[in-house]
Amino acid sequence: MLAWALLSAVLWSLAGVGSARSSLFSNEGFVYGTVGHPVKIYVKLHQTSPVLVCMDIDRASKETVDPIYLWIGPNENTLTGSSQINITNIGELVLKDFMESLSGHYSCTLSYKIVKAETQEETSLKKKYDFLVFAYREPDYSYRMAVRFTTKSCVGRYNDLLFRLLKKILDNLISDLLCHVIEPSYKCHSVKIPERDFVYELFVAFQVNPFAPGWKSMCNSSMDCEDVTNHNILKARDRIEEFFRSQAYILHHHFNITVPAMHFVDHSFQVTRIDNCRPGFGKNEGLHSNCASCCVVCSPGTFSPDMDVTCQTCVSAHVYGAKACP
């Protein structure tokens, strides 16, 4: 409340007075194969995958005689148990502490028999199931915001003073969250109000992101750092929104007839979320429609070197999650 009152008081003194994810996911967390069609699965970084079942749903509902399961991993190697790979005796695969390098094509071949009870005649059958497993992480959120303030004129030093003061107040408001205001700018325009004369208004725009100096210190105890930074930026967004809402309240309830010549324009606050992906990850709604909002690991043949949202083409990138084009 102190920040809100401070800005209103300074505005008054500055300018005087004016006029007023998988399609085959079961409820139990099991993913079944489909003969002839690879099943796409998305696993959050450092988390555990769902259970990949070496059967289709129809086969799983029937008796299976003498089943043998053979899992092949992304490097065409036969999978065996390890700290990150767990294969049960009924052919179920679980991937733990999922990393970019675990992404890729997994296949399982199910061999089984059909036995005629009357003759004991055996028929051997095989079915192959393909799974495409991708690491993903949540996008990093930032916010683009815009507000307007009335002003007496488009010339003079008061507009710059207001602009610098506003940035300082907003930075102080969210500094404990290690968020900050970046790329601030403003332009002054003359605006014709319906049934009123022209007024001068400052169109202020800025971004808020959760990467103020020292932000990494908040991630020391979390593997999913974007969960921490996204939580902080959401709180920062709410604080800033409440700040401008309070500016409107103060204007309407504390200034009555006489209002500052420079004041917040009610209902002018706008906010838009911007998503960014960490290096090695990107968005592709066409390729990953089941995880369209996710930052999915860049596939071989692509890379992402920065916080962009797309993976760029690179024919010499042969691994998942490439951050450079060799």
Swiss-Prot record:
Post-translational modification comment from the UniProt entry: N-glycosylated.
Source taxon at top rank: Eukaryota
Residues the record marks as carrying a glycan: N86, N220, N256
Localization, UniProt: Secreted; Cytoplasmic vesicle, Secretory vesicle, Acrosome
Coiled-coil parts of chain: none
Signal peptide: 1-20
Keyword Ion transport among record annotations: no
Family, similarity comment: Belongs to the zona pellucida-binding protein Sp38 family.
Listed name of the protein: Zona pellucida-binding protein 2
Taxon lineage: Eukaryota, Metazoa, Chordata, Craniata, Vertebrata
Name of the gene encoding the protein in the UniProt record: Zpbp2
